[in-house]
Amino acid sequence: MKQYTNAIIFGIAIVASSIFLGKAYTDRSKADGEIRVTGLGKTDFSSDLIVWEGEFSAQNKDLKQSYLTLEKNKAAINKYLVNKGIKSQQLIYSAVKTDENFKRLYSSDGKFIGEEFVGYELTQTVKIESNDVDKIEKVSREITELLNQGVQFYSESPRYYYTKLANLKIQMISKATQDARLRAEKIAEFSGGRLGKLESARMGIFQITGQNSKETYSWGGTFNTDSREKSASITMKLTYKVE
């Protein structure tokens, strides 16, 4: 009799467990009745703003003579750039930086015995910002012609920017959202359901890389300034209910 009673209790427990698990599975399925998709918006564009900088200097033991030489070099640079079609008001010169240079002295047996003053070095930079990308790009390559005038000019690589970035970002968000919705509709269609209302939307990181470059995306966002031709991309993560 006791064994029979135990069997009944065990059977009831199994049935109860089955009902509970079945309900839990149904509730989980309802909770999971949604589609999560990621859409991509991407486009290529060309920079419309160039920033180019260069540095020149003068060295002499006499500070005044160093400054006179620097001013002479500056005048030669200014004339050269204006002759290349750059307006003088576009030339932004930095303040003059002054450094004292010393030579380390050693004894015949290699021991350090002190320093000798060798002169002053005065350094100045010039910067140009322009929407005429072709012109400034050409000047940055030809600036070494100043060497023929005895002017040592150290040219940096140009940096490229896009002034309509805010509008471009809006376009990319729109493209990414459309792409994500299309993916969600296809998933719902293939699963026999119908796409419901949008539950959530989350924007990814805006990335700008050089076209056909080996640059990789970063968590904080990539912002390329080395390439004139660029690619922009952004992702949108959407969650839809499924009906």
Which residues are covered by each model-predicted region?
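Short, charge-dense linear interaction motifs
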Residues: M1-I92, V96-E243
